[in-house]
Amino acid sequence: MPTHSRSRDRYGGRDSDREARYDYDYARRRYATDDDDDYDDDELEHDLTERRYRRDGYRPPRESRARGYYERDAEGAADEELLGNERDPGPRASRSYGDDYDARRREHSRAREAPRRSERHRDRDREGRSRRRAYEDDGRHRTRDGRRDRGRESDGEARRSRRREAGRETAARKHRSSDSTNSASHLLSADALAKLGAQYEKEERRKREIAKDAAKAERKRQKKLAVVGEETRALRDPPGESHRDRTKARVASGAYLEEGRSPEMRVRHRGGGGPAMEARWRKEGSWGGTMDDSGGGRPFWKRKRWIGLGALIIILVIVIPVAVVVSKKHDNKSDPADSQGTSPGKSNLDGLSHDSIPAYAQGTYLDPWTWYDTTDFNVTFTNETVGGLSIMGLNSTWDDSARPNDNVPPLNEPFPYGSQPIRGVNLGGWLSIEPFIVPSLFDSYSSVSGIIDEWTLSKRLGSSAASTLEKHYATFITEQDFADIRDAGLDHVRIQYSYWAVATYDDDPYVAKISWRYLLRAIEYCRKYGLRVNLDPHGIPGSQNGWNHSGREGVIGWLNGTDGELNRNRSLAVHDSVSKFFAQDRYKNIVTIYGLVNEPLMLSLSIEDVLDWTTEATKLVQKNGITAYVALHDGFLNLSKWKSMLKNRPDKMLLDTHQYTIFNTGQIGLNHTAKVNLICNDWYNMIKEINSTSTGWGPTICGEWSQADTDCAKYLNNVGRGTRWEGTFSLTDSTQYCPTADTGPPCSCANANADVSKYSADYKKFLQTYAEAQMSAFETGQGWFYWTWRTESAAQWSYRTAWKNGFMPAKAYAPSFRCGDAVPDFGDLPEYY
């Protein structure tokens, strides 16, 4: 009897010897299992941690799983980095309030010891205060003493003028004298003396104008003080403290930076100056046109303006060419054959009035004027709901006559499940974020910031999360993708969504409900191109597996822990709403598979609890009118275990299994030909058997698989985690799991991660054969869904990239290789990639 696809026993003992040394902390840890070869062993009572079908290196989350982020304030850490040049020199560690206070106290002490150290503060006393304001704040009579000061200034100016006149007369006598002691070769001519005198007079006039302006500003200030009176004095800063001193030390936040106002912060430093403050001062009329206390000279911000402008030009000269090069490189690497438009469409709002939206709905997710993209949405307002879920954006009519190709019936005719295989793709990383699919959302954060999943990303983005993620929803998958899916010969789409498309709870930072609108539009695009839909709840309340693609990496809180029962009920409430919505007539022909939960980790959860919930959820959605097949995941149990499980289940249920070789250290190290043989021998028979109601469980689909033969894709094993292929995955073991690990040369991810334009013909031939072998094996069951349709840079995980670059069949229903055919020769293809 063939071994299970996820078994490592037949490949020698090195896997089991190293099992205890492997951490289970990786993003798609759902895949590698240490399965039992005995298909007849159906006992479920053994301790889960002792089962031979345990996933490779798995340890229960509550024992060994690292959360992957620190409990420290991640937002503060990033602000430290972003504002590093603004702070005092020193370590970048986050400082406490006490540290900030000590720093300010030391700065204050320096002001007392050396008030003239800085030219900008020569008018301050040893206490760091403005000499003028210090005296005023000590209780002077402002009106009387102001007149006295102006009188003293006038007397002083008169004395200085007499001294200057005396000096000029002395110089003139000297140059008029014929005395040899007063003669020299460098004596100036009369014209030169005249020019010098004119220049001197011009300088004097400028100084007098400055003094006049200063006096005018002082009179204006005194006048304002007299009008405001005691109220103004009550609001005045205490002696020795300016307004700037009261500003909080931290002036930056993630949201502030997201708004594009970081240049303002660089000017503001720790709370003073900058465009925002200057505009406010002008508006209040309390700014005399300068930031200099003396009232003279060019204002600080004007002196800096030209310097800043010059620096900005230099930066742009450097940054723009680099950005263009990086952008071109990124586009070529992710999908060289195509590029997605990023300009939002809002033309269907033309001619409409915002007043057509009720006041209570304006500014909410029901207001199309707040949407990033309104293309193909019905923007006529409605607050109607079904199952508590909005229908806003939908048209009232639909057409189910389309078909994707001649091999598939149109939507208004039943699909022959059981006699014709499903050929579909997933839309992973779109409405449920996954780092390795969209690394650009995570690349801007440092490794210590702890931004590792949608929870931490949404929390970090704060008020900008909605706009950032909606732009991703609108641009990552568009109508053109559904047209391409049809043209590739595919006929089904498995669409991921998470519970926050429906509702959020407690302190959830997730963006609520916006993805719901894009889910509904995606289904309408599927309808247009004749594609049937498999709904896949990828994240449910509490997390069903503790992995990043469930929304939050860490502890499993569904059916487990303190809030396990609470989240159980919440997940049923989500299905109650969603099932009522998709039980509408408009979805009867198109939503043909209804998923319950993606990849519940039954190696950690109570199997009985999961099965009880599955039965209850299935009965609930069917009671609400769902006639589609209901899909449940195998939970990573050995498929042979399912032969005796849920025998008395409700009707129309599918078992969903996800198969990958690269997360199993016994399989990732096979050479190219051996991997194809594994698929066509072991997997082929395994799927065929479990799909039978007499020898297995019954109708079985493969909801996820990939042609990737390495785990080299960036962030695939978690943000910041290495690879098994190069021996950098484990924190304690550097063993490489690749075909040439023992003989050399060392395996490298360079070729697997290279731009697809650099793939050799032999490598493309292998990748296509490897994919077609899996298609053949999974079609012995109900069919398959490839993971995934599109990625930003992981070419071997993108059906779209492979299809457009010649290492997927031109039509999914017409492969060039099937199991039973001779495995082709892959030429001189090296085994180390």
UniProtKB/Swiss-Prot annotation:
Quick check: keyword NAD in the entry? no
Major subcellular location class: membrane
Q: Which UniProt keywords apply?
A: Carbohydrate metabolism, Cell membrane, Cell wall biogenesis/degradation, Glycoprotein, Glycosidase, Hydrolase, Membrane, Polysaccharide degradation, Signal-anchor, Transmembrane, Transmembrane helix
Q: Which residues cross the membrane?
A: 306-326
Q: Which PANTHER family match?
A: GLUCAN 1,3-BETA-GLUCOSIDASE 2, GLUCAN ENDO-1,6-BETA-GLUCOSIDASE B
Q: Mind listing the GO biological process terms from this record?
A: cell wall organization; glucan catabolic process
- What top-tier enzyme class does this entry carry? hydrolase
EC number(s) from the headed UniProt entry = 3.2.1.58
Location of region: Disordered? 1-228, 331-353
Q: Where is the composition biased (Polar residues)?
A: 337-346
Q: What does this protein do?
A: Glucosidase involved in the degradation of cellulosic biomass. Active on lichenan.
Q: Please report the name of this protein according to its UniProt entry.
A: Probable glucan 1,3-beta-glucosidase D
Instruction: Please list the residue ranges that the record marks as compositionally biased, kind Basic and acidic residues.
Output: 1-33, 46-75, 97-172, 200-217
What species is given as this protein's source?
A: Aspergillus fumigatus (strain CBS 144.89 / FGSC A1163 / CEA10)
Q: Which GO terms describe its molecular function?
A: glucan exo-1,3-beta-glucosidase activity
What is the catalytic activity of this protein?
Successive hydrolysis of beta-D-glucose units from the non-reducing ends of (1->3)-beta-D-glucans, releasing alpha-glucose
State one Pfam family annotation. Cellulase
Query: What InterPro entries does this protein map onto?
Result: Glyco_hydro_5 (IPR001547), Glycoside_hydrolase_SF (IPR017853), Glycosyl_hydrolase_5 (IPR050386)
Q: Where is the composition biased (Acidic residues)?
A: 34-45
Q: Which gene encodes it?
A: exgD
